UniProtKB/Swiss-Prot annotation:
GO terms for cellular component: actin filament; adherens junction; cytoplasm; microtubule cytoskeleton; nucleus; plasma membrane. Residues 283-298, 574-598, 857-867 have a biased composition (Polar residues). Plays a role in the formation of adherens junction and the polymerization of linear actin cables. This is Formin-1. It is present in the adult kidney, testis, limb, ovary, brain, small intestine, salivary gland and harderian gland. Isoforms 1, 2 and 5 are detected in skin and keratinocytes. Isoform 5 is found throughout the embryo. GO terms for biological process: actin nucleation; dendrite morphogenesis; forelimb morphogenesis; gene expression; hindlimb morphogenesis; kidney development; limb development; positive regulation of actin filament polymerization. Residues 870-970 form the FH1 domain. Residues 1-624 are annotated as: Microtubule-binding. GO terms for molecular function: actin binding; microtubule binding; SH3 domain binding. Keywords: Actin-binding, Cell junction, Cell membrane, Coiled coil, Cytoplasm, Cytoskeleton, Membrane, Nucleus, Phosphoprotein. Residues 458-842 are annotated as: Mediates interaction with alpha-catenin. It comes from Mus musculus (Mouse). Was originally thought to play a role in limb bud development based on the fact that limb deformity (ld) mutants are associated with Fmn1 gene disruption. However, PubMed:15198975 shows that limb deformity mutations rather affects Grem1 cis-regulatory regions localized in Fmn1 gene and that loss of Grem1 (gremlin-1) expression is the cause of limb malformations. Residues 970-979 have a biased composition (Low complexity).
Length: 1466
């Protein structure tokens, strides 16, 4: 991608939106977008700010998670182990990258305008140590690309920072080729240089699948790192065994003993690293005035420049002697989840004895390869490389053993690692003014990083970092020269191995190196000793920054985490919190090892927040000169060539802001031993306000002015149209899939609910059927049960009264049973007496469910007890005894019976007594219902009482002093006892009788005190003929027995299906016709045989003819009739039966067609005659009417008069009739009337005359108006013929033919009339042939009267047809005569004059003329009426007669006269 912006100090920074897509040979195209801004501070130090921009749907990661962005795992709160494992999985797709992607770092470093591709000058204070740049002239020629190197040759000139032009892939390949050619000659110089790789603060969620490619010269051969193979053993099986995969992360459970990074030089390493080393050296030489940043080590001030150079020279020589290649040394930098406050310091200690100091052994967590620093080192032993090659052929791992480490650490100090010159130069030039940039850009960042550069000992002293901070320390072993003292604090440390494969770490760390955004080193102001937290630590989410990129960060919650690679604010950038990446004196690359990664727990990290709180993402620092197994040589050369000119330092993390350009610095060998420490400080986020309050005084830049927060970044579109459409399609597809899923779920749930509903419904229906069956059985049993009320009182008082029972129903008459009474006496049970009021409580006349005899109560203490003999259900119907009829129905006004209690416990029931009517004998009424007695124990023989047949026991006497309440309906004080049954036996009629609703009186024989009544002595006679009585008074209806359900089901099953032979639609049509006929087939047959259209009209006959059975249908029906039985014929559907019966009429189709044609012919010939007659009448009217000629002559006169003096139009003898419709458009001068109005008025005034006979004859029988008109017009009587004006009278006639006739005549076409006549003639002949066929084929009994009627019709039809033909010919001749008579010519484009043209002209003119003629006739009538009235008034005025008015009320004669007149009129 081409750089398209220029960073100017006088303008706001220009933000650029970049999109980087990656070529993955085995996957889909992925990419990411970021916005970057390159700005300068007042010292011309450039730094870059980047924000990730999310476009379209999430990019599918390599872990087969379709909805997860490749970098999204950084934003999730996952343990570091899982993050690094995910990094390991991503390496499988990072083998082949496009060169164009790797060259995309130039975007951030190129300025626009007419600056000739040069970077702006960098104002850097460099040290004056001449020992640093002894071979600066030799380094200058090795800078691959950049105008910076050309500028570095002038050491007396202040180094400026300028952009370089982008280089095409061809140029890069050529440069790599050149470097390869001269790399062998200059390897000595390059081995003495330091190389630095900018690592990226990269989150897994934000980064796409990228990888860094290294130069071929940096590939490390033969087991350079011991931990790579060990880590490779724990790799997932699905990861390809690529060089990168072999260097992938292994198990986090490994101890830190695997951190030994030793190995021999690779024999196939490319010598092109010399050029890279020269670049690093040139970078140093161009920044001599940079003051060094002292290290926390005690030996920070004891390294001399000459010693470092000599050590570097010896290292280079030893490398050339071994294999002319340079190995690598890697320093673990750091890794952290986006929200994890972890601080790490990679610290390399120089031990004189080659010992390496390490931290605690507890920290063995995964570290990305970008967190390791690769330093070209000196000689290494190669005996461990064979071991690696045996395990993994073709893959060069970095392994080492303890003896190798010992030998390597004792290497002379001259073997100093080379450093990328351009990156060092950029690092030295990045002296930022934090306050200026933070306010100018509107960002509040809590990331600061200050880089220190090599300097002389006398120029600067280094302070220890603040002890208040916690950090991670990675001790880097190095070989110290003889003059350089070793730090005392590191001499006693153990030597564990590197926990991860460094090559894999590097390969997995910077997938966005092609983006080339600046890395921000994390300052480490903390104490170098802090406890390590748990290995799988969780990281807190950080609040979003109120900056320009906040909108972008807000798109995902994880983007709100502050990152240390942003713009450093004025308060956060302090010298105390620095990131130092220093080389070791004479340390071989393999002896330089990352000892330990210390993780600080969240509590410890949060407690250590000070003024320099820093939040750092995983900064994977990868020097361009990495020599790991997982990097191809060619790709690495491209990477080196790209990282060299990256003065702005690309931040490789989309969505985070970059700080100073380089993550850490590799100082030269000549520096103090304190510069061999790498501090990476990771602190939680701290708001800018806190740092503003705690940061000591920092000067703010006057220019450029600070950038307000409201200033919007001017960028282009963040997405392309194709991406937008792709996102829309993706969302639509997701929406559609979601809708389909919801619909499927809904249908499934509906199906389940319907199934459950059907199941519940079936169960309920089954329960209903069971209840119905139970109810039916119980109803059948209720007919044989009754209620039995038994008194259970023990006192047997003598009875002092008798009961008189009144029988109200034949069926309810109770017969006393002696057997029951005997059985009751034998059982010594005396029932209590019941109130007689309960005898009135009985069901309706037809109800037989409950029957209970009631018992009169003698006192308020007695109560009624009734029981049922069978076991009682919830609503038990008791069984009555065979000889006891049911009680009478309830009288009106009484409530229902109390429910019967169950059998075993005899429950007392106290019914409320009714109000007592006034009895003839004084009986004291009861005050209320008495309390019921306690229930007696169940009786063993109670169940046998109703059917025992024994007489009931005598009722006990009531207590003295109390009388029972009188029963309702009794006119005397007699009461009946339920224990005493009626005297008369029950009568059982042979059939149910109508009830006689009387009030029954029953007399008790044992009652002694009652007075004798009629009923005692009255004897009931015997009915002699009961059959007659039953016949007369029996019930009309009887209950029908219900049929069993089995029979009903059997009948339903036996119903046979109706047979259909026709198509469904056809059968429906015939069925509709049958339902609309309302006729029987006999009527239809008779109407057809007799040709009678009064019964079957023509429309019905036509419908029958159209819906008659076709041949195939008729064949099916006839075949079915022939092959089926009579029972099956009844099952045939009605449409089929109807068509079959219709087909039974002989020659139905021919007969129907003849009858239909007879009606059609009559209508057709009548229509033709009417049309011909209209044309003939219109033509003759125009030819023979004198008034038509008068009107045309009048128009001719007016036209010639109007055209007088005009030689072309005047003096006309005639005119074309086309002018007639246009006369109404000729207006008068005042527009009050037109020419047609004037013609009509003139005609009515002077032309409307007619001859009449004598005026008297003309005036006879006229009304007063005619008389007035006659008198006014003709005052003198004249006899004989005379001419007079009739205008305005009823005698006035319209002078033209009727306009409607002209309109109808215009619709006639002679061609159509001729066609209709010919059609009728053909149909007539065809119908005649059908008649002959009918007469030939039909039986003789069906010929008459069809034959006679049809023959007569055809004779008449032929005559009428001939007459209409002659009439049509006459009409045509008359029309042609009319056209010629008026001189009309055909229309333009037509050959003949058509009736429509001629008659439409006359129709329009006649319509206008008739409208005006009616109006003017009315006006003339009004004028003549006025004249007649004036004449009459004049005559009456001359003959005045005085008349006396008579008062009708005063004169008796007048009243009589009026009365007579009224009577006569009536």
């Amino acid at each position: 991608m081409e750089g398209t912006h220029c960073t100017l100090q006088l303008h706001n920074p220009i933000a650029e939106l970049c999109y980087i897509s990656f070529y993955l040979p085995k996957g889909e195209v992925r990419g990411f977008s970021y916005k970057g801004t390159v700005t300068l501070d007042r010292s011309n130090n450039a730094f870059h700010n980047c924000y990730q921009v999310r476009e379209g749907p999430d990019i599918t990661s390599l872990s087969q998670q379709p909805n997860e962005h490749p970098g999204d795992i950084f934003f999730k709160q996952t343990p570091t182990k899982n993050i690094l494992t995910e990094l390991y999985k991503l390496t499988a797709e990072k083998e082949r990258l496009l060169d164009s992607l790797l060259r995309s770092d130039n975007i951030l470093g190129v300025s626009m305008g007419s600056q000739e591709g040069k970077l702006q000058e960098l104002s850097v204070i460099l040290a004056t140590g001449d020992e640093y740049f002894q071979s600066a002239g030799n380094w200058r020629r090795e800078l691959p690309v950049s105008s910076l190197i050309r500028r570095s040759t002038q050491e007396n000139k202040k180094p400026r920072r300028s952009g370089r032009r982008r280089e095409s892939p061809e140029e890069l390949r050529q440069k790599r080729t050149r470097r390869k050619g001269r790399g062998c000659q200059e390897s000595a110089f390059q081995m003495g240089k330091d190389q630095v790789c900018s690592s990226s603060s990269l989150s897994f969620r934000a980064r796409p699948n990228l990888r860094l490619l290294e130069e071929r010269g940096n590939l490390v051969p033969r087991g350079t790192l011991t931990s790579s193979l060990r880590r490779r053993e724990s790799c997932p099986a699905n990861i390809l065994r690529t060089p990168d995969a072999d260097l992938a992360f292994g198990n986090s459970g490994r101890t830190s003993e695997d951190t030994d990074l030793e190995g021999p030089l690779s024999p196939d390493s490319s010598p092109t690293e010399v050029g890279d080393a020269d670049v690093g050296g040139q970078l140093k030489s161009s920044h001599q005035q940079e003051p060094p940043q002292p290290n926390v080590s005690e030996s920070h001030g004891k390294h001399a420049g000459a010693e470092r150079w000599s050590s570097r020279t010896r290292k280079s020589k030893s490398l050339e002697r071994t294999c002319s290649k340079k190995p690598v040394s890697k320093v673990v930098a750091k890794i952290q989840e986006p929200s994890a406050p972890v601080k790490r310091i990679v610290r390399a200690h120089h031990d004189g004895k080659g010992r390496v100091a390490y931290g605690p052994e507890t920290q063995t967590e995964f570290i990305p390869k970008a967190d390791f620093l690769t330093l070209p080192g000196g000689e290494t032993e190669t005996h461990s490389s064979g071991r690696l090659e045996e395990e993994q052929p073709g893959i060069k791992s970095l392994r080492s053993s303890a003896p190798e480490r010992a030998s390597i650490t004792k290497e002379p100090a001259s073997t100093e690692a080379a450093v990328n010159k351009v990156l060092r130069k950029v690092i030295e030039s990045e002296k930022l003014d934090e306050a200026t940039e933070g306010k100018r850009l509107g960002f509040s960042l809590n990331t600061r990083a200050t880089h220190t550069f090599p300097e002389t000992r006398s120029q600067r002293k280094a302070g220890l970092p603040q002890s208040g901070h916690k950090f991670l320390l990675l001790d880097l072993p190095h070989t110290v020269g003889p003059d350089s003292p070793q730090p005392k604090c590191d001499e006693k440390k153990p030597t564990p191995q590197v926990p991860t494969a460094l090559g894999m770490v590097f390969n997995n760390s910077s997938p966005q190196s092609s983006a080339h955004k600046r890395l921000s080193p994390v300052p480490s102001p903390l104490s170098p000793r802090c406890p390590s937290p748990q290995q799988h630590h969780r990281i807190l989410l950080l609040p979003p920054l109120p900056s320009e990129g906040e909108v972008v960060f807000n798109e995902y919650p994880s983007r709100k985490n502050d990152v240390s690679s942003g713009f450093p604010s004025a308060d956060t950038l302090e010298p105390s919190s620095t990131t130092k990446v220093t080389e070791t004196k004479g340390a071989s690359p393999t002896s330089l090892r990352a000892s330990q990664t210390w993780l600080v727990s969240e509590e410890a990290s949060e407690k250590g927040l000070g003024p320099e709180k820093i939040t750092a993402p995983p900064q994977h620092q990868l020097p361009p000169g990495i020599a790991s197994e997982g990097f191809p040589c060619d790709n690495f050369k491209e990477q080196t060539a790209k990282d060299l000119p990256n003065k702005d330092g690309g931040v490789w993390v989309p969505g985070y802001r970059a700080g100073p350009p380089c993550p850490f610095l590799l100082h030269e060998e000549k520096e103090k031993t304190s510069r061999s420490e790498l501090y990476l400080d990771l602190n939680p986020d701290q708001s800018p306000t806190e740092q503003d309050d705690r940061t000591p005084g920092r000067l703010q830049a006057v220019w450029p002015p600070p950038k307000t927060k409201d200033t919007e970044e001017k960028v282009g579109l963040k997405y392309t149209e194709a991406e937008y459409q792709a996102a829309i399609l993706h969302l639509k597809r997701e929406h559609k899939e979601e809708i389909e899923t919801l619909q499927a779920q809904f249908e499934l749930k509906t199906f389940h609910i319907r199934g459950e509903h059907a199941l519940v419904t079936a169960r309920l229906e089954e329960a209903i059927e069971n209840l119905k069956q139970q109810l039916g059985k119980r109803r059948e049993g209720c007919e044989e049960m009754r209620d039995v009320c038994i008194s259970t009182d023990d006192d047997c008082s003598p009875k002092a009264f008798r009961n008189v029972c009144i029988q109200t129903d034949r069926e309810t008459f109770l017969k006393p049973c002696d057997a029951e009474s005997k059985a009751t006496r034998s059982s010594q049970i005396v029932p209590k007496k019941l109130t007689i009021s309960l005898t009135q409580l009985s069901p309706s006349k037809d109800s037989k469910d409950i029957h209970a005899p009631f018992q009169t109560r003698e006192g308020t203490s007695s109560s009624s007890q009734h029981k049922i003999s069978p076991p009682a259900p919830p609503t038990p119907p008791p069984l009555p005894p065979p000889l006891i009829p049911p009680p009478p129905p309830l009288p009106p006004g009484l409530g229902p019976l109390p429910p019967a209690p169950p059998i075993p416990p005899v429950c007392p029931v106290s019914p409320p007594p009714p109000p007592p009517p006034p009895p003839p004998t004084p009986v004291p009424p009861s005050d209320g219902p008495p309390p019921p007695p306690p229930p007696p124990p169940p009786l063993p023989n109670v169940l046998a009482l109703p059917n025992s047949g024994g007489p009931p026991p005598p009722p006990p006497p009531p207590p003295p002093g109390l009388a029972p309440p009188p029963p309702p309906g009794l006119s005397f004080g007699l009461s009946s006892s339920s224990s005493q049954y009626p005297r008369k036996p029950a009568i059982e009629p042979s059939c149910p009788m109508k009830p006689l609703y009387w009030t029954r009186i029953q007399i008790n024989d044992k009652s002694q005190d009652a007075a004798p009544t009629l009923w005692d002595s009255l004897e009931e006679p015997h009915i002699r003929d009961t059959s007659e009585f039953e016949y007369l008074f029996s019930k009309d209806t009887t209950q029908q027995k219900k049929k069993p359900l089995s029979e009903a089901y059997e009948k339903k099953n036996k119903v046979k299906k109706i047979i259909k032979l026709l198509d469904g639609k056809r059968s429906q049509t015939v069925g509709i016709l049958i339902s609309s006929l309302h006729l029987e087939m006999k009527d239809i047959q008779q109407a057809i045989f007799t040709v009678d259209d009064s019964v079957v009209d023509l429309e019905t006959l036509a419908a029958l003819y159209e819906n008659r059975a076709q041949e195939d249908e008729l064949t099916k029906i006839r075949k079915y009739y022939e092959t089926s039985k009579e029972e099956d014929l009844k099952l045939l559907d009605k449409p089929e039966q109807f068509l079959h019966e219709l087909a039974q009429i002989p020659n139905f189709a021919e007969r129907a067609q003849c009858i239909i044609f007879r009606a059609v012919f009559s209508e057709g010939i009548t229509s033709l005659h009417r049309k011909v007659e209209i044309v003939t009448r219109a033509s003759k009217g125009l030819l023979h009417m004198k008034s038509v000629k008068d009107i045309l002559a009048l128009i001719l006169a007016f036209g010639n008069y109007m055209n007088g003096g005009n030689r072309t139009r005047g003096q006309a003898d005639g005119y074309s009739l086309e002018i007639l419709p246009k006369l109404k458009d000729v207006k008068s001068r005042d527009n009050g009337m037109n020419l047609v109005d004037y013609v009509v008025k003139y005609y009515l005034r002077y032309y409307d005359q007619c001859k009449h006979h004598d005026q008297e004859a003309s005036c006879r029988g006229k009304d007063l108006f005619s008389l007035y008109f006659h008198i006014a017009v003709h005052p003198q009587r004249k006899s004989g013929l005379e001419l007079k004006q009739e205008a305005g009278t009823d005698k006035s006639v319209f002078p033209l033919p009727e306009p409607q006739d002209f309109f109808l005549a215009s619709q006639v076409k002679f061609e159509d009339l001729l066609k209709d006549l010919r059609k009728l003639k053909r149909q007539l002949e065809a119908s005649e042939q059908q008649m002959k066929l009918v007469c030939k084929e039909s039986p003789r009994e069906y010929l008459q009267p069809f034959k006679d009627k049809l023959e007569e019709f055809f004779k008449k039809a032929k005559k009428e047809h001939k007459m209409e033909e002659s009439h049509l010919e006459n009409a045509q001749k008359s029309f042609e005569t009319t056209v010629g008579y008026f001189g009309m010519k055909p229309k333009t484009g037509e050959k003949e004059v058509t009736p429509s043209y001629v008659f439409m002209v006359w129709f329009e003119f006649c319509s206008d003329f008739k409208t005006i003629w009616k109006r003017e006739s009315k006006n003339i009538s009004k004028e003549r009426l006025k004249m007649a009235q004036a004449s009459v008034s004049k005559l009456t005025s001359e003959k005045k007669v005085e008349t006396k008015k008579i008062n009708p009320t005063a004169s008796l004669k007048e009243r009589l006269r009026q009365k007579e007149a009224s009577v006569a009129t009536n």
